[in-house]
Structures are given as structure tokens and as C-alpha cells.
Design a protein with these regions (language model features):
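Alpha-helical transmembrane segments in eukaryotic/viral proteins
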Residues: 12, 17, 837-848
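N-terminal entry motif of extracellular EGF-like repeats
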Residues: 737-742, 766, 772-798, 819-837
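Repeat-scaffold signature, strongest for collagen triple-helical Gly-X-Y repeats
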Residues: 797-800, 809-810
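Single-pass type I membrane-protein transmembrane alpha-helix
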Residues: 841-867
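Interhelical loop segments of eukaryotic multi-pass membrane proteins
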Residues: 867-875
Length: 921
């Protein structure tokens, strides 16, 4: 009996455990509301919260019309393009919503600590969809035509057919080691002041800058082998493969406080604390603003929505660019940006150029469409602003040297496009564009892997980590890694020279263009346009050395004390930003990465001295960190002894080498892949060089054979006539391509069969099959046709700004402005022309005529009225005479002499009086 009672009690408890949560789950979990309605309301509230924070940020930026602070300039340079911004915003909505859900769930006693244990799968999918993240987490739909093997997609998607998101824009950076977040999921290293690492707190990043990293501008050592162009190329290529967007909001999501006004860690605010004394950088403030990088959708705390809130799904950061070496610096990484950059009116597949300015007949980059924070020439008229430049990467205006390289490639694309069109007149504008883009991408790969990376790694490390190309490997993930982007490839910051040198035709200091301090060229495109153009700057990059990375001279004070300084409104410290970014991303410590690269761990001061032979620097690092495991990977790798004939130590050589091999071997469109170019084309591509690019796109007539090798002019320079160049005859098509009305087709082969892939000219859409294949019975489908698109009806993505009127024309559209406005640089936005409207001149003329007419009419009326009054008075006098003469005769006769006498006297008086009156009138 007792056994039966015990069994019954057990069954009752089991049933209650199973059924009661099921019964109450819909009500009690959220205080009487249904699960779905309450959770959805939380998501909507979170969406409003994030939107409000972003709105406050935008409103603050719009009000800011004077000189921008360094923090605002950094935010501008980190501003993602619209697609990346949408992904970031969706992730932030999810991040904020899950925090709210956690609070509700965790406050309930005896509830599971994971929302996934109490939220249904359908509801989780609904939440993900409402936040906006779900579409960006699904695999992209890859095109199924043979063109998919001919040209890479602008987004980088579908490069790997089995893993279409590998290397694509707006996907998470790769993790080669698990992150080291303080909570295991999302919280940065150093977030909690009480959190200890091996018994010690992490040192403040600003203190590391001041004691270990910074050197005065006058104390830098110059590199005796490599030119300043080596440094610039590294920065340029970094911007081709990696861009981590900051939070879209500059205000805390909870409470909405401005991140520039708080020194507390409130997501997305992660401020850099100032030193307690003697810190010139932060005089008058307690901290420097810093914003966390956006999380990739579905990672970190957002993982709760996808059933994976755990340390196995930590917060990941997003790469807004394609990972591939594909010249996205020239063409962008999204269809929207690519559309802005192209010249759609040209039949030669050109890129847009600046419409207002030229450099001795050569093109400049176009300006951005709206007012930008770039500096203006002192004393310049506000009506003649020089905005930031528009390029494939938004950081093109950060520094003049970087702008110069962007400009060279704009010119090179257009040069190639014109030549290719001349060789193949039957090619459509899009075919010319794609072929020129393909060549430019290949040249980026060649210059980087053949000329740049071996100098950085040294020949031995290059052979060990990169080696010879053996063909495309579909099992290799080319995605840029977090440690490469956030730490290793930032070694180049230690090679930035504090001076910008501009040279004359003889490669001497220019008499009219003195050297500039680094902080004088930040966000200053006006200097390129107003001060001599591209050539003096390029001469300086070729003939002047880079800064040498020395252990006790790691970074010049132009970067640590005056980063992005355009006014007296503060500054930033690049070294501190790098260290804080590594902690934000949860990068494991220095020793973890040494172990990853099969290098020995450093456990003692003596061990550290072997990796860093400058004992003073090694001791400072140990005194600050207290333990080698605590050392931030960026600083540890930066301070290591160089490998032989290299510009990095063993750790960074390993990380950079592994990444470059992955970018090469995991890229289906790598230039050496025999399916991408013909053998003849590959031979021609190998001849080209950065020196040749400079010869073809500047006024320079002599250059070094190797543009990265510093030399003396003229003995180390070669005539451009002797610099090898591409013979584009290898791209001539020998067969005729028939014309297609308002479109074109491209020949290609698929499974050994001839195929035609059709495309329409810009402004037309395809109706029918995009690809037709030649079979035994003829073409498998009839050819498609191209129909005009009415772009003006596109309400989701209107072609013209709201300030302009859209007019559809055949194959295109026109944006029309009302006088006195005119089309801006983007040809879509109306801007003030600075003059009176034409209608104003007509109005003034008509007004003058009208006023003159009214004055004349008034004068005429007055004169006519005066004349009429005079004539009336004369008529009255005559009438009086007549009346007098016609008075009754009887009366006159009765009066006779007496009346006659009186009458005669009176008449004399009246005439006298009348004459006097007429005279007065």
C-alpha cells in the first residue's frame, strides 16, 4: 500500500511538472499576458528604443554645422553604407530586445535562465523577422547562369557555391580562437572594473599609449628600404577587405544618454578612461568616447532568439565589406553603392568622375552628394565647398595619401574601359565595365601578393604560411578573421610617417607646397584640389621613406595626440582605439595567439625579453600588465622582434600569412585560377605593376621599377617608357556579337555547350529567359526582350531625391529642379545655385514696366482732371454773361439809369475778380 501511495505521489508530481507549466506558460510568465503578445510588444518597444537613439544621433549631426570633433569624424569614417547600416540596426534591435526578455524571464522565480526554454520556435522566428535580422541570416540566392563563373558578385556572395555566405559582405568576421568575453557571451574585456585577469585588472589603454607606444614626431626613425607608398598600400588594402561598423547609435539604448557625455559603460558606450594626471589628450574631460562595434545578427545575447544563448554562440562582429581582394575600394561592396559610382550615361562602362574639378585634364573622385564633415580651405567662400570624396570605401578622405591611391585606381579603370571598348566596339557598357573591373581586381591581387606581402612577412615566413598557388580550394573559408582585422593588420599604424612630403618635378621639396604635419591632412580633400593636385603627393610617396617600426618608437604623436584634429574641439588616440577595439571584440590575450601559431608561450619577464629584445620596453609592458597572459594581442605582436628581411615579428607574420593564403586559395575568382583568365591574359597581367599604374595615370615620366622600394632620384628611377605594361590585345574578341535591341548578350560555355546570357542596358528590364543554351534541337528558349523601366514609379528606392522631380525617359530618367536650384554632384539632388531664379529677372522687368505704367497713368489722370477743371471754370464765367444778358428786359428798363449805373460798376468788379481767380488757378 505504501508503495502504491508513493507511486501515486510520484505520478502526480510528474504530471504537475509536465502539465502545469504548459497550462500556465501562456499567462504567468509575463504577468497575465499571453506569451506572444507580450514578447512581441517587448520587441516593438526595443525597436522604438533603438530607433529613438539613432534619431537623436542623426538630429545631433544635422545641427552640427561648424568644425567637427575628432569623435564625429571617426564616426563619419566608420559610417556603413545603407545595407550594412540596416543589418547593424536589426542586430541592435535584437540585442536590446533580448536584454528586455531576459529581465522579464530571469526575474521569475525558478524559471529557466534561457528564454529559448520558454519561447516557442514559431515565436522566435517571428521575433527575428520583426527585428529585421532574419533576411540577413538566410543563405543568399545565387544566380544560375554561366555568368556566375565569369564575374564575381559585387557583394562577394556565392563565391563558394557550397557556402555562399563565405567572404560575403555584412557577415560575421571569422573566429580562429573562441573569444574571451568577461561573461562568456558579449561583455568586453575590461568592461567590469572588478574583473581580474590572473589576479590583476587590465591596465587602462591610455596608460599603455603614453608609457609604451607613443613617440614624438621628431624622434621617429625612417625606413632605409621602403617608401611611404608601402605604408599607404597596406592601409588601402586593409580598406579593401575589412570594415567593422560601429553601433548605428551614439547614444545608450537604455536611457538614451549621449555616449560623448558619459564615462559609464552602457551599451553601445564603452568609453576610454583618461589618466588621473598629466593627460593632455583629455584635459577637462574624464574619458574619450568609444562606441562598440555592431554585433552580427543572431550572435551573442541575440542567440537566445535562435535557441543558442551560450558560450558556443558568442557575440561576433560584422565585416561590412567583401573579404576578397576584389577592389571593393573602387567599386563598393553593395549594389546600391556600385550604382552611385558608375557613369550610366557612358557606353564605355566608365566610373563617375568629379564634374567641377580636374587635375590637368585628369579626373578626380566625385564628391559625396550631401554636406560632409571634411575640412574647408581657410577663408574659402562657403558657397564653394569641397566635400569629402565618394569612392568604393567611405574612408577615402581620411588622409591625402589614401585619397591619392583611390584616385589612381579610378583613373585606371576608366583608362582600361576606354581601351577595351575601342578593341571591342560590339561590347555593351556593362560588359566593358565588368571586364575592366575584373582586370583591376586582378591587379590588386598581384600587387598585394607579389609585391607587398613578401616584404611584410619576409621570404621565409611567406614561404611557410603562404607558399605557391596550387589552385582554388573549395574547402578553404576566405572570410577575414577577427584577429587579423582588429589586431595583426593594424601593424601598419606603426609605419605612418608624421609628415606628408610633396615634391616638385625634380623630386625635391616643393617651393610652393611645404611639407605638412599629419594632422593637417586629415579629411582635407581641398588640399588635393587647391594645392597642386596628385603629382606632388605621389612623388613624395615614391621618393620619401616610411617610418620604421621600432620597439621604443611604435606610433608617432600625430596619431596618438592629434588624430582627426580639425579644430580645438578635442582629439583622439589611435593606439588607445586599437587596444579598446580588441577588448570590445573579446580577442584572447597575446599568449593564446602565440600558442595558436605554434610559438612558445611567454611565462616570465625573461621569456618576454626573448621576444622583445628592447629590455626597457619589455619591462614596461610587464609592469603594466603584471602577467604575460594579460597582454593585449595587438601590442604584444607589434612589439616583437622583426623576422629576417621582414617588417613584422613571428606572431603577426603567422596571422597575416594564414589570412592571405585563405584569401587566395578560397577565392574562386583568384586571377591565377585557370578558369578566370586565358593563359595569354595571365601573362599580360603579370607584367603590370603599381609603377605602371602611376605612369599611366599621372604626369610623372620617371618612377622606380618597384614603387615600394625607396630610392634616390634620378639614379634609382626609370623612364616610364621602360616600365612594362599590359597589351590588351589579349582581350580582343575575334567573333562578331549580334546587336540586341536595348540589350546585349555574352558568350560562355556550360557543361560543354554554347550558351548566351542576356542583359539589358541600364534602364531596361529583361522579359524572358536570361540564359539560352544551344542543344541538339536548337536554342532551348526564344531570346528575351528588353523593356523600358519607369524608374519614377519606384517608391521603395526613388531615383531622384525628394527635392527633385523625376521624369521618365527611354532607358533612363531625369531629375529636374525648379529655378533657382540645380542638380548636385550626384545628379539626383537639387541644391541651391546661389543665384536669383530666371523668373526673378522676368518678374523684376514686368514689375518695373507695371510700376512705370501705373505712374504714367496716374500722371495722365491728374493732368486730365486739372484741364477739365480749368475748362469748367471758363465755361461757368461765359454762362454767367449769357444769363446776365438774358435777364428780363422789363426790370432793366424799370431801373433805367440807376440800375444801369450799378450794373456797370458791378460788371467791372466781377471781371476783375474773375481775372484774378483765373490767374490763381
Amino acid at each position: 500500500m505504501k508503495a502504491l501511495v508513493a507511486l501515486g505521489i510520484t505520478l502526480i508530481l510528474a504530471c504537475s511538472e509536465v502539465f502545469f507549466p504548459f497550462i500556465w506558460r501562456g499567462k504567468d510568465l509575463f504577468g497575465g499576458k499571453t506569451e506572444k503578445s507580450h514578447v512581441l510588444s517587448i520587441v516593438e518597444e526595443s525597436k522604438v528604443m533603438v530607433d529613438n537613439a539613432i534619431y537623436k544621433t542623426m538630429a545631433r549631426n544635422l545641427k552640427k554645422r561648424e568644425a567637427n570633433s575628432p569623435a564625429q569624424l571617426l564616426s563619419f569614417s566608420k559610417l556603413p553604407e545603407p545595407t550594412s547600416r540596416a543589418v547593424s540596426q536589426a542586430a541592435e534591435v535584437m540585442e536590446t530586445a533580448i536584454q528586455a526578455v531576459k529581465r522579464k524571464v530571469y526575474l521569475k522565480p525558478k524559471q529557466s535562465r534561457h528564454p529559448t526554454d520558454v519561447l516557442s520556435e514559431d515565436l522566435l522566428n517571428t521575433i527575428a523577422n520583426i527585428s529585421g535580422c532574419l533576411p540577413y541570416m538566410l543563405p543568399p540566392k545565387c544566380p544560375n547562369t554561366c555568368l556566375a563563373n565569369k564575374y564575381r558578385l559585387i557583394t562577394g556572395a556565392c563565391n563558394n557555391r557550397d557556402h555562399p555566405r563565405w567572404g560575403a559582405a555584412n557577415t560575421a568576421l571569422a573566429r580562429w580562437l573562441p573569444p574571451a568575453y568577461e561573461d562568456g557571451i558579449s561583455q568586453p574585456r575590461g568592461w567590469s572594473h572588478d574583473f581580474l585577469y590572473n589576479g590583476f585588472p587590465l591596465p587602462p589603454v591610455r596608460e599603455l599609449t603614453r608609457q609604451v607606444i607613443q613617440v614624438s614626431n621628431e624622434a621617429v626613425t625612417e625606413d632605409d628600404q621602403y617608401s611611404d607608398l608601402l605604408m599607404v598600400w597596406g592601409q588601402y588594402i586593409d580598406h579593401d577587405i575589412a570594415f567593422t561598423p560601429q553601433s548605428t547609435s551614439k547614444a545608450a539604448f537604455w536611457g538614451g544618454i549621449d555616449c560623448q557625455l558619459t564615462c559609464e559603460n552602457q551599451n553601445p558606450c564603452f568609453p576610454i578612461q583618461q589618466l588621473p594626471f598629466n593627460d593632455s589628450l583629455t584635459a577637462g574631460t574624464d574619458c574619450l568616447p568609444f562606441y562598440r562595434s555592431s554585433a552580427a545578427c543572431g550572435t551573442g545575447h541575440q542567440g537566445a532568439f535562435f535557441g543558442n544563448l551560450s558560450e558556443s554562440n558568442p557575440r561576433q562582429q560584422m565585416n561590412g565589406l567583401t573579404s576578397f581582394l576584389d577592389a571593393s575600394t573602387v567599386y563598393g561592396s553593395s549594389p546600391a553603392l556600385e550604382k552611385q559610382l558608375r557613369n550610366w550615361t557612358s557606353e564605355e562602362g566608365l566610373l563617375r568622375v568629379n564634374r567641377r574639378y580636374q587635375n590637368e585634364g585628369r579626373a578626380y573622385l566625385p564628391f559625396v552628394a550631401r554636406r560632409s564633415p571634411c575640412a574647408q580651405e581657410p577663408g574659402a567662400d562657403g558657397a564653394d565647398r569641397i566635400e569629402c570624396f565618394l569612392a568604393g570605401d567611405g574612408r577615402a578622405s581620411e588622409a591625402l595619401s589614401l585619397t591619392a591611391v583611390h584616385t589612381l585606381w579610378l583613373r585606371e579603370h576608366n583608362r582600361l574601359a576606354v581601351a577595351l571598348k575601342a578593341l571591342n566596339p560590339h561590347w555593351s557598357a556593362d560588359t566593358v565595365y565588368q571586364e575592366a573591373r575584373k582586370i583591376v581586381g586582378a591587379l590588386h591581387q598581384i600587387i598585394t601578393m607579389r609585391d607587398y606581402i613578401p616584404k611584410i612577412l619576409g621570404p621565409e615566413a611567406f614561404q611557410e604560411y603562404v607558399g605557391l598557388y596550387e589552385g582554388y580550394d573549395a574547402t578553404v573559408d576566405p572570410t577575414v578573421s577577427n584577429v587579423f582585422s582588429t589586431a595583426a593588420f593594424r601593424f601598419g599604424h606603426a609605419t605612418v610617417h608624421p609628415l606628408v612630403r610633396r615634391l616638385d618635378d625634380g623630386f625635391q621639396e616643393h617651393p610652393d607646397l611645404p611639407r605638412l604635419h599629419l594632422h593637417d591632412v586629415f579629411f582635407s580633400p581641398w588640399r588635393l584640389i587647391r594645392e597642386g593636385g596628385l603629382d606632388p603627393l605621389v612623388r613624395g610617396l615614391l621618393a620619401r621613406p616610411a617610418k620604421l617600426q621600432v620597439q621604443h618608437q611604435l606610433m608617432n604623436e600625430g596619431l596618438t595626440e592629434k588624430l582627426f584634429v580639425l579644430s580645438n574641439s578635442g582629439t583622439l588616440d589611435l593606439a588607445s582605439l586599437n587596444l579598446q577595439r580588441g577588448r570590445d571584440h573579446g580577442l584572447p590575450g597575446y599568449n593564446e595567439w602565440r600558442e595558436f601559431c605554434s610559438l612558445p608561450r611567454l611565462e616570465t619577464q625573461a621569456d618576454l625579453n626573448t621576444a622583445i629584445n628592447n629590455r626597457s620596453v619589455a619591462e614596461k609592458i610587464m609592469n603594466l600588465y603584471k602577467h604575460p597572459d594579460n597582454i593585449d594581442v595587438w601590442l604584444g605582436g607589434l612589439a616583437e622582434n622583426f623576422l629576417p628581411r621582414a617588417r613584422t615579428g613571428p606572431l603577426f607574420a603567422c596571422i597575416i600569412g594564414k589570412q592571405m593564403k585563405a584569401l587566395r586559395d578560397g577565392d574562386r575568382f583568384w586571377w591565377e585560377n585557370r578558369h578566370i583568365f586565358t593563359e595569354a591574359q595571365r601573362r599580360e597581367l603579370e607584367k603590370h605593376s603599381l609603377s605602371r599604374i602611376i605612369c599611366d595615370n599621372t604626369g610623372l615620366t620617371r618612377v622606380p621599377i618597384d614603387a615600394f622600394q625607396v630610392g634616390q632620384f634620378p639614379q634609382d628611377f626609370e623612364s616610364c617608357e621602360n616600365i612594362p605594361h599590359i597589351n590588351l590585345e589579349a582581350w580582343r574578341e575575334t567573333f562578331h556579337q549580334d546587336k540586341v535591341e536595348n540589350g546585349d548578350f555574352v558568350h560562355c560555355e556550360e557543361a560543354g555547350k554554347r550558351a548566351l546570357v542576356y542583359s539589358c542596358h541600364h534602364g531596361y528590364e529583361l522579359q524572358g529567359q536570361e540564359q539560352i543554351t544551344c542543344t541538339d534541337k536548337g536554342w532551348d528558349f526564344p531570346p528575351p526582350v528588353c523593356k523600358d523601366i519607369n524608374e519614377c514609379k519606384d517608391l521603395m528606392d526613388p531615383p531622384c531625391h525628394l527635392s527633385a522631380e523625376c521624369k521618365n525617359i527611354k532607358g533612363s530618367f531625369q531629375c529636374l529642379c525648379t529655378d533657382p536650384y540645380m542638380l548636385g554632384e550626384d545628379e539626383r539632388t537639387c541644391v541651391d545655385s546661389g543665384r536669383l531664379p530666371k523668373a526673378s529677372f522676368v518678374s523684376i522687368t514686368l514689375g518695373g514696366v507695371l510700376i512705370g505704367g501705373l505712374a504714367a497713368l496716374t500722371w495722365l489722370v491728374i493732368c486730365r482732371w486739372t484741364r477739365s477743371d480749368t475748362e469748367s471754370a471758363l465755361a461757368t464765367t461765359d454762362r454767367e454773361r449769357e444769363i446776365t444778358s438774358q435777364l428780363g428786359c422789363g426790370k432793366c428798363q424799370e431801373m433805367k439809369i440807376s440800375q444801369q449805373s450799378i450794373s456797370t460798376q458791378g460788371t467791372d468788379k466781377d471781371f476783375a475778380s474773375g481775372s484774378q481767380t483765373l490767374l490763381c488757378k
